[in-house]
Design a protein with these regions (language model features):
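Conserved helicase motor core of SF1/SF2 NTP-dependent helicases
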Residues: 4-34, 40-82, 154-168, 183-356, ...
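Short coil/turn segments at secondary-structure boundaries
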Residues: 5-10, 129-135, 166-176
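ATP-hydrolysis module of ASCE/P-loop NTPase motor domains
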Residues: 78-148
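Ser/Thr-centered flexible coil motifs
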Residues: 145-152, 202
Length: 459
C-alpha cells in the first residue's frame, strides 16, 4: 500500500516487475508516474520495453535521475542560472578547493576536503557547523577532533562562497537544494515514482525521489540488486533517506530466468565471501538464488600471451558460435574499457565482420552485427553469448597491491574499489543467456579461481 522494494539477483525479473507496475499505475485516469533509473543508456533500453507494453505516453515520464533533477530544478527555479559541477568527474570541484587552499593554511589537501564535503556534509545534508560537529562520519577512516572539524567548516564556508561567486553548484548539492525546496513548499510533482537499479543511486538522490511523491498508497516502487553496485563510493541507506522498506515492504526474487545454472554459479563465485550491504542495515545474500535453466555449458576462461593472441581467441570463439547457428547480433564483446577494444574493432573491420559500438546512448555501426561495449555499458542488456576481454588481475583485481590504483587509497576505499570490480564482473557474466567466454593476458584474475584457465599458444 505504501513504498515497496523488490530486490533479487541478475535475471530474476526486477525490471519486468517495475514495467508491469508502471502499466498498472497508468490505468489510473489521474496518473502522472515517473519511471527513472541512473543512466541514460538504461532509460533508452527501458523505453523500448514500455512501448511494447502499450503504456499511454501521456501518463508517465521516463528519464534518468540527472535529467529529472535538472528539469525539476529548472521548473521551480532552484539555483537558476547556475552551472552544475561534476558531471564528468571531480576536477572542477578540486580546482575550486585548490583556490581555497591558496589563501588558507591547513593540514588537509583538496582531495580530502572534497571527499569530506561530498561524503559527509552533502551526503547527510549538514546545513551548519552545529550539525557537522554532531555528525557521525560513517565510512571515513581518519578520525577528526572538534578543533579539526571547526577548521574544516570554515574552509567549507569559503568554498561555498567561491561557488556562489562563480554561480556553480555541486551535483549532489543541487539534489539536496531541490529536495529541500519541494519539501518546504509541500510540492510533490508525481502521483507515483518507480526507480529501477536502486543500488546505483546515492542518498541525496534517494531523498530527492522521496520528495517527488507524497507518502501514500503506491508512492514509491524500487527495484535493484545490491550486489550489482558497480559505481564505487555511492553510499546508500534507505532509512537515512526517509524511505521505509522494512518488513512487508520488501520482497526478494530468487529465480533466475536468464542465465543457465553453470553461468550463475561462476557469477556468484565472483562475489562470494564479500559482505554486501542490503542498504537498510543488513547484509545481502545469494542464498536461494537459483536458475530456472539447470543445464548448460560452463563459462570458459583462457589466458594467452599478448593482445594479438587475445583478439585471435575471440575470433575463434565467434567462428564456433556462427557455426552453431548463433547470429552476430546475439553476441556481445565487452572489455573493462573502450581502449581495450580498439584492436578487436580493427580486426573486425579488417575481416569485414559487421559490428556495432555501444557507447553511452550512442549506437554506431550495423544493428545486425556483433556489439562492442564496456562492462559498464552491459548493464541492463542481455545476449545469447557474451565474450569478455581484458580479464586479468590488473583490470579485475582480487586484492590490493602497493601500486596503482591502490597507493592513493585508504583501507576503506580499497575495499570499496575491490567490491565494485567484483560486482562489475558479476554484472558482465550474468548478461549471457547461454554462453560466456573470458580471455586475457598477463596474470589471471584471482576473482575467477573457480574457473579453470588454459594457456593457449597461437604461434
Amino acid at each position: 500500500k505504501g513504498t515497496m522494494k523488490v530486490s533479487g539477483g541478475a535475471g530474476t525479473g526486477k525490471t519486468i516487475a517495475a514495467l508491469h507496475r508502471l502499466k498498472y499505475l497508468c490505468e489510473n485516469p489521474n496518473a502522472n508516474v515517473l519511471f527513472t533509473t541512473y543512466t541514460k543508456t538504461l532509460s533508452i533500453n527501458i523505453a523500448d520495453s514500455i512501448e511494447k507494453l502499450g503504456v499511454p505516453k501521456n501518463k508517465y515520464t521516463l528519464n534518468n535521475i540527472d535529467r529529472v533533477l535538472l528539469d525539476t530544478a529548472e521548473k521551480y527555479k532552484v539555483k537558476e542560472g547556475y552551472k552544475v559541477l561534476d558531471y564528468s568527474g571531480d576536477e572542477e570541484s578540486l580546482k575550486l578547493w585548490r583556490e581555497v587552499l591558496e589563501t588558507e593554511v591547513t593540514e588537509f589537501d583538496e582531495q580530502f576536503l572534497y571527499d569530506e564535503y561530498i561524503d559527509v556534509i552533502v551526503y547527510f545534508g549538514n546545513k551548519d557547523a552545529k550539525q557537522y560537529m554532531m555528525q557521525p562520519r560513517v565510512g571515513r577512516t581518519k578520525a577528526l577532533s572538534r578543533k579539526q572539524r571547526i577548521g574544516i567548516w570554515k574552509l567549507v564556508e569559503k568554498y561555498n562562497a567561491l561557488k556562489q561567486e562563480r554561480r556553480v553548484v555541486d551535483r549532489l548539492e543541487l539534489f539536496n537544494e531541490t529536495t529541500n525546496y519541494l519539501n518546504e513548499n509541500n510540492i510533490h510533482p508525481y502521483t507515483n515514482v518507480i526507480a529501477d537499479e536502486f543500488q546505483d543511486f546515492s542518498n541525496p538522490e534517494l531523498k530527492f525521489l522521496r520528495a517527488l511523491v507524497a507518502e501514500g498508497k503506491n508512492d514509491l516502487f524500487l527495484t535493484g540488486d545490491p550486489i550489482q553496485r558497480i559505481y564505487n563510493g555511492r553510499k546508500i541507506n534507505f532509512g537515512a533517506a526517509g524511505i521505509n522498506v522494512r518488513g512487508v515492504r520488501s520482497r526478494k526474487l530468487k529465480i533466475n530466468y536468464r542465465t543457465t545454472e553453470p553461468i550463475k554459479r561462476v557469477a556468484v563465485s565472483v562475489v562470494k565471501g564479500v559482505d554486501y550491504d542490503d542498504m537498510d542495515g543488513g547484509k545481502e545474500s545469494t542464498n536461494g538464488y537459483v536458475s530456472l535453466i539447470h543445464e548448460g555449458v560452463a563459462p570458459q576462461y583462457k589466458i594467452v600471451d599478448d593482445a594479438n593472441s587475445e583478439v585471435q581467441q575471440v575470433v575463434e570463439w565467434m567462428k564456433e558460435c556462427l557455426d552453431s547457428n548463433i547470429k552476430l547480433s546475439e553476441i556481445c564483446i565487452a572489455a573493462p574499457s573502450m581502449n581495450l577494444l580498439k584492436e578487436m574493432q580493427s580486426r573486425l573491420h579488417h575481416d569485414g565482420t559487421d559490428y556495432r559500438v555501444l557507447k553511452g546512448t550512442q549506437k554506431q555501426g550495423c544493428s545486425n552485427g556483433v556489439d562492442l561495449c564496456t562492462f559498464h555499458s552491459l548493464k541492463g542488456l542481455e545476449y545469447r553469448v557474451v565474450i569478455l576481454m581484458g580479464v586479468n588481475e590488473r583490470n579485475l583485481p582480487s586484492k590490493a597491491t602497493e601500486g596503482y590504483p591502490f597507493s592513493g587509497m585508504d583501507k576503506v576505499a580499497q575495499k570499496e574499489y575491490l567490491s565494485s570490480k567484483r560486482s562489475l564482473l558479476y554484472v558482465a557474466i550474468t548478461r549471457a543467456r547461454q554462453l560466456v567466454y573470458m580471455v586475457g593476458f598477463g596474470e589471471p584474475s584471482g576473482l575467477l579461481d573457480v574457473v579453470t584457465h588454459t594457456k593457449l599458444d597461437f604461434s
